[in-house]
Amino acid sequence: MSEQNLVCGRLSGLFGMAKRAGRLAAGFDASVGTLVTRKAYAIFRAADASDKTVKEISFALQRHGSTLSLGELPLTKRQLGDALGTPKPVGVVALTDKGFATAVGKLLDLPAD
């Protein structure tokens, strides 16, 4: 199994656990809601999210004074939706738990806060 497939599998598992734990907001509106309430520790977009989605979520980050940056996942919208157990593709997710956010950041080799 390639390293990319291994990372994608682990990310899918982490996002699934975070959703079951109630620590994940799936979709654009839910993710922006976590920014408004300042509950988000990390926000990510699918690899194939549209330019419009990226632009709007980046604008929402700025508008709400968030210090978070938008991370890109190696998962497609379909893969992300499957990981969350939804029949629909999901382009944006926010994590509301520092532990899950840290674990995903480590898998993606992102700098820690």
Locate each region found by the language model.
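Catalytic cores of RNA-modifying enzymes
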Residues: 1-9, 19, 99-102, 109
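Short active-site oxyanion
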Residues: 21-22, 40-42, 65-70, 91
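N-terminal positively charged helical leader segments and presequences
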Residues: 36-64
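Short secondary-structure boundary segments
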Residues: 47, 73, 97
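Mid-chain, well-packed structural core segment of small domains
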Residues: 59-89
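C-terminal structural segments of small proteins and small subunits
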Residues: 81-111
